Amino acid sequence: MDELVIETTGLRKVFLDRRGRSRVAVAGLDLAVPAGGVHGFLGPNGSGKTTTIRMLLGLARATSGSMRLFGTDVPKGLPTVLDRIGAVVESPKFSPNFSGRQNLQLLARILGAPPTRVEVAIDTVGLTGRDRDRYKSYSLGMKQRLAIAATLLKDPSLLILDEPTNGLDPAGIREIRDTIRDLSDSGVTVLLSSHILAEVQQVCTSATIIGNGRMLASGTVDELLRSGSTGFRVTVSDPDTALRVLSEGGFSARRTADVVTVDSDRPGSDISRLLATHDLWVDELVPVRQDLESFFLELTAGDTLGGPTTDVAR
């Protein structure tokens, strides 16, 4: 079994609202993040991602369940592993009139980190050449990279990033994505919480999808995609009749404009053969390639606290 840097068992968090009513934010979450690579932590807004991260970092108290970081029980043992963890959970505060370098130098002195770590952090996040510019002149993407640089001053083994690309333009998203890849290549394990699924698919090696505070699926990205539905887009002269024939033939199908989409792992020849027996001739039969966003939407549709859990990890 791979070494786990993060492990939660039955993790639960219940809040009381202003009227004193209980609200479940995290409902018995079992999370396992292996060492190495980039692990996506995915879920709709309000699914419990940030609450889970805050509990792992000792910023919120769990109602019940257990948590372990590097095999150490937390929050009790958190001080012994804190130097191995870097995290960007909320927008950090930097001095606007200091340069990026000056901000990092000040923080390094506070943390007791050697001055050489400032150079390493600046280089790692790609701020070389802009590190002497004032913080207030930075773009949002550069500010996010400086925030990541600050977490690297203690040379962490685990980096936790909560929605690091929120509000960024495409160029800023690409910069953060490249930074995450570089960190992973250097041996840092990254837990990436995000809802920008196309970006996650490009950078993550594994992922956990949660909904309503509970795990819905977990595994490598390839395993998650293989576990989702596949199918074909069918172009035919009479889509209404084709939809009826396919439905009566046991296929799950739906029509969008003049195209019939069939959700099935059966061969495409089965579809064309069935249609041909009803004198429906296929003009085009195109395999549908499942992406992470499609799988995510399929998995979280109608999700409830009592919904099924899928663990596709092998």
Task: Enumerate the language-model features and the residues they cover.
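C-terminal coupling/interaction segments
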Residues: 2-3, 264-314
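ABC transporter nucleotide-binding domains
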Residues: 3-211, 217
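Residues at or immediately flanking beta-strands
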Residues: 66, 99, 231, 281-284
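Short alpha-helix boundary/capping motifs
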Residues: 111-115, 173, 236, 265, ...
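Short, flexible cytosolic linker that couples an ABC transmembrane/permease module to its adjacent nucleotide-binding
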Residues: 120, 222-226, 309
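ABC transporter nucleotide-binding domain
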Residues: 177-263
